[in-house]
C-alpha cells in the first residue's frame, strides 16, 4: 500500500517541491515585488491543487496507512507528523511550522492552509472522517493525570478555567479576566481538559459553564460569558489552526454534544469509567449561564448546550462578517435552532440578539432578571436538578442523533476545515486583524 501511495504521490510531490523552490528563492514576505508574489501564488496554488486531487482519490488509503487501518487513534498533531513522514511534502513538517511560529499572522507563509487541505481531504472520506472525529473524543492526557485529584478534592485550577464539583454539577468557570474571557489556544486546551473531567467523574451528573468576573476596566467586577476569539492573539499569529480552530470543533465542543470516548490510542479503556455496553461514549447534559454577552465563539457554544440561561441585560452576536472567519459549526446549527432568516441576519449581517427580544427565546431557554444577583444562580440550580433526572441522558442522546447525525457533521467539517484555513490567511482578514489588534 505504501509503495502504491508513493507512486501516486510522485506528480503532486513535484508540484509541492517546485513551490518550495520558488519560496526559497524569494526575500522576506514584506520585501517581495508584486511579480514575485504572483509567481509564488501560482506555484502554491498548483501544489495545493495537486494535494487536493491526490487526497480526493487516495485520502482513505493515506489515513488507513497512518492509523493501521483505523486500529489506532491519533491526535491532530500526531496525524500531521505521521503524514509528513509517510509522504514528503503532503503536509508541512514540524520544522517548517516552527519557522512560522512567532511571526505575526500577516507575516506567515500560510502553511496552515496546507494542513487545512490535508484535514479536509481526510474528512471528505466517510470512514476516515468518522474515525478522525472519534479520535478527538478521547480524554486528554492532562485530564487523566488530574482525575484522581479532581475526584478527591472536587476542584482543579486549569489556569484559564476553574472546575469545581458542587452537588451533582461540575461548574466550569472561564477565568481570562483581562481579555473579557476571549478564547485563545490556552483556553481551548483548558476547556478540553475541563469537559473531560466533568464527563469522567461519576459523581457529576450535569455540567455548567459560566464566565468569571472581569478585571478589564470597562467591565470590572462583572461576569462575562465570552468575547469570542482573542483578536490580539489572532493578529500576533498566536491562534493556531490545529490547536484552536480544529481542536475546538472536533474536541471539547463535540464532547459536549456527543460525549467522551474513554479509550486510549489503541481503543483500550483508559480508566475504570467505561461507557455502558449499549453506547461507546459517556454523555452528560450541559447548562450555559450567560452574563453580559456571548460574542462570536461564545454564542457558538450555546448551540451545543441542553439548557441556556441568560441574564436580562445580556446579548448574543456572531460578528463573522466583521472578523472575516467562519463561526465554527454555527452555520450548521443556528439555522436548525432559530431558522434560516434569523441565522442569515446574525451570521451575514452581524445582528445582535438581546436577551429581552422575542427572538432570544429561540436560543435562550430562560431569561432572568439581571437586577437580582441571585436569579441566575437560582435558575442554574433548578436546571441542574431537572437535568440530573435519569431519563434525560437517553433522550438527549436520541435528540442528538435526530438533529445532527455524525455523517452530517463530518460533511460540514470537511468543508469547514478547508475554508476556515483559507479565511485565516485571506487579505481582508489580515487587514482586519491589525485593526482589531488593540482590542481584547
Regions found by a protein language model. Name each.
Residues 1-142, 155-156, 262:
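Long, compositionally biased, glycine/small-hydrophobic-enriched stretches that function as flexible linkers
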Residues 4-50, 310, 314, 364-411:
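C-terminal long alpha-helix characteristic of the crotonase
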Residues 6-11, 117-219, 237:
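Conserved CoA-thioester-binding segment of acyl-CoA-metabolizing enzymes
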Residues 44, 48, 59, 73-108, ...:
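Glycine-rich beta-to-alpha active-site loop
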Residues 172, 209, 230, 301-302, ...:
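Hydrophobic/aromatic residues within transmembrane alpha-helices
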Residues 172-173, 190-268, 281-282, 287, ...:
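A structural preference for short, pocket-lining loop segments at secondary-structure junctions
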Residues 271-390:
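Crotonase-fold acyl-CoA enzyme core
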Residues 346-347, 395-399, 437:
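Short alpha-helical scaffolding segments that buttress acidic/His motifs in well-ordered protein cores
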Amino acid at each position: 500500500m505504501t509503495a502504491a501511495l508513493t507512486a501516486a504521490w510522485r506528480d503532486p510531490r513535484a508540484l509541492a517541491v517546485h513551490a518550495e523552490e520558488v519560496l526559497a528563492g524569494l526575500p522576506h514576505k514584506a520585501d517581495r515585488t508584486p511579480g514575485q508574489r504572483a509567481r509564488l501564488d501560482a506555484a502554491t496554488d498548483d501544489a495545493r491543487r495537486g494535494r487536493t486531487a491526490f487526497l480526493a482519490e487516495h485520502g482513505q488509503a493515506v489515513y488507513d496507512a497512518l492509523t493501521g487501518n483505523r486500529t489506532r487513534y491519533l491526535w491532530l498533531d500526531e496525524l500531521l507528523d505521521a503524514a509528513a513522514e509517510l509522504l514528503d511534502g503532503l503536509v508541512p513538517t514540524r520544522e517548517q511550522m516552527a519557522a512560522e511560529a512567532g511571526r505575526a499572522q500577516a507575516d506567515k507563509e500560510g502553511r496552515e492552509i496546507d494542513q487545512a487541505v490535508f484535514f479536509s481531504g481526510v474528512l471528505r472520506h466517510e470512514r476516515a472522517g468518522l474515525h478522525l472525529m472519534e479520535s478527538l473524543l478521547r480524554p486528554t492526557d492532562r485530564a487523566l493525570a488530574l482525575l484522581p485529584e479532581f475526584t478527591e478534592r472536587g476542584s482543579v485550577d486549569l489556569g484559564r478555567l476553574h472546575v469545581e464539583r458542587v452537588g451533582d454539577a461540575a461548574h466550569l468557570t472561564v477565568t481570562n479576566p483581562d481579555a473579557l474571557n476571549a478564547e485563545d489556544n490556552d483556553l481551548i486546551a483548558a476547556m478540553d481538559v475541563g469537559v473531560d473531567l466533568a464527563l469522567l467523574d461519576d459523581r457529576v451528573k450535569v455540567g455548567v459553564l459560566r464566565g468569571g468576573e472581569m478585571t478589564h476596566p470597562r467591565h470590572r467586577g462583572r461576569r462575562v460569558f465570552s468575547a469570542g476569539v482573542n483578536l490580539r492573539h489572532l493578529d500576533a499569529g498566536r491562534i493556531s489552526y490545529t490547536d484552536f480552530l480544529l481542536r475546538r470543533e472536533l474536541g471539547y465542543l463535540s464532547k459536549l454534544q456527543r460525549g467522551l470516548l474513554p479509550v486510549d490510542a489503541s481503543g483500550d479503556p483508559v480508566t475504570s469509567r467505561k461507557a455502558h455496553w449499549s453506547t461507546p461514549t459517556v454523555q452528560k447534559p450541559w447548562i450555559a449561564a450567560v452574563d453580559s454577552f456571548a460574542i462570536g465563539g461564545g454564542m457558538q457554544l450555546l448551540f451545543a448546550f441542553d439548557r441556556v440561561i441568560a441574564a436580562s441585560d445580556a446579548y448574543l452576536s456572531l460578528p463573522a462578517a466583521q472578523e472575516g472567519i467562519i463561526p465554527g459549526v454555527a452555520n450548521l446549527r443556528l439555522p436548525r435552532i432559530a431558522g434560516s432568516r434569523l441565522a442569515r441576519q446574525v451570521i451575514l449581517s452581524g445582528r445582535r440578539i438581546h436577551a429581552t427580544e422575542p427572538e432570544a427565546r429561540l436560543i435562550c431557554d430562560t431569561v432572568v432578571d439581571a437586577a437580582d444577583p441571585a436569579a441566575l444562580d437560582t435558575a442554574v440550580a433548578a436546571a441542574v436538578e431537572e437535568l440530573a433526572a435519569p431519563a434525560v441522558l437517553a433522550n438527549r442522546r436520541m435528540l442528538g442523533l435526530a438533529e445532527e447525525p455524525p455523517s452530517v457533521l463530518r460533511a460540514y467539517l470537511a468543508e469547514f476545515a478547508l475554508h476556515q484555513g483559507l479565511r485565516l490567511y485571506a487579505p481582508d482578514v489580515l487587514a482586519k486583524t491589525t485593526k482589531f489588534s488593540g482590542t481584547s
